[in-house]
Amino acid sequence: MSNPTSTPRADGFRMPAEWEPHEQTWMVWPERPDNWRNGGKPAQAAFAAVAKAIARFEPVTVCASAGQYENARARLDDGNIRVVEISSDDAWVRDTGPTFVIDDKGDVRGVDWGFNAWGGFEGGLYFPWQRDDQVARKILEIERRARYRTDDFVLEGGSIHVDGEGTLITTEECLLNHNRNPHLSQVEIERTLRDYLAVDSIIWLPNGLYNDETDGHVDNFCCYVRPGEVLLAWTDDQDDPNYLRCQAALRVLEESRDAKGRKLVVHKMPIPGPLYATQEECDGVDIVEGSQPRDPSIRLAGSYVNFLIVNGGIVAPSFDDPKDAEARAILQRVFPEHEVVMVPGREILLGGGNIHCITQQQPAPRKA
């Protein structure tokens, strides 16, 4: 496997949009007891349901530790799901896995960003994180794909969304946070994104969703549904702490033009809840120094925007919430050619994310 010293853009590679054809989707099996309650068993059932939903549309590869391999293999009883042994610190492959890039000659490579558990020693969610920082490299080794490594640049895949036509959306709350790349200016961060993802226009939303442990990842708040159109988490409740965040994001989106000069169409997606963990759910999480404590008084950052686009389908979270039906209807309206499949997302949310956070698509090779 090669490790180019150039950049993807210089080599003719770009990050494709999520709706472009996939070869497969990657996941990592959950087991960390100080993040997933009851030894991870409820989360494992939730991850298995997500993997099987995706497997209806495309192959899935799930990475599991040596200690969990047999259990994962037994629970993932689907002919379209492969299980491979990879050690990791937790299960957020959107943030620890590679960001795949493609060219027009049929090649696929991967960007291996630096990872510091969403903030390192200044607000990070756990320590150590070395095994998570190795996940992208291991995946690229398995796939025999060239690897671009950014040793001096920290980025999580959930902090970016692209339209595949030169535009990227992110949040200032995350990418400009001093606990990610304090040695870089906004201009330098933008230059890195342009060089490694081949984007030309970057839209900066001020914040992500309220109480998002990742410092406001955009994939829990706003995403592209097609070039020129985005889906934004939304509330009309002026007493909701998300209200001002939604308003500020809408202003930026309405004032922005993408790399093709288009004015963006903004679709609104209601925010579920408010949702909270129960005391019982919190009590099921092991208490370990350096890990994120669980508190039933803290609102969960639930979002229907945290879905995955797969080949011919949309796999989205449900929350046993009155807004579930409306969310499904909106997804079906904005993705009329896709089948919408909703999978219970509460157990994933309790761990700090949702379906988009626990998946990483690998694009299929394409020739122009």
Swiss-Prot record:
Q: Name one GO biological process term.
A: putrescine biosynthetic process from arginine
Key words of the record: Hydrolase, Polyamine biosynthesis
Hydrolase keyword on record: yes
Q: What is its EC number?
A: 3.5.3.12
Group of enzyme by EC: hydrolase
Q: Does the keyword Hydrolase apply?
A: yes
Catalytic activity entry: agmatine + H2O = N-carbamoylputrescine + NH4(+)
Q: What InterPro entries does the database record attribute to this sequence?
A: Agmatine_deiminase, Peptidyl-Arg-deiminase_porph
Give this protein's Gene Ontology molecular function annotations: agmatine deiminase activity; protein-arginine deiminase activity
**Record Pfam families:** PAD_porph
Residues in the active site? Answer: C357
The pathway noted for it is: Amine and polyamine biosynthesis; putrescine biosynthesis via agmatine pathway; N-carbamoylputrescine from agmatine: step 1/1
- What this chain does, per the record? Mediates the hydrolysis of agmatine into N-carbamoylputrescine in the arginine decarboxylase (ADC) pathway of putrescine biosynthesis, a basic polyamine.
- HAMAP family tied to this protein: Agmatine_deimin
Q: Could you describe the subunit structure of this protein? A: Homodimer.
Database matches in NCBIfam families: agmatine_aguA (TIGR03380), PRK13551.1 (NF010070)
Q: Which family does it belong to?
A: Belongs to the agmatine deiminase family.
- The name this protein carries in UniProt is Agmatine deiminase
What are the leading ranks of the lineage? Answer: Bacteria, Pseudomonadati, Pseudomonadota, Gammaproteobacteria, Pseudomonadales
Name the gene behind this protein: aguA
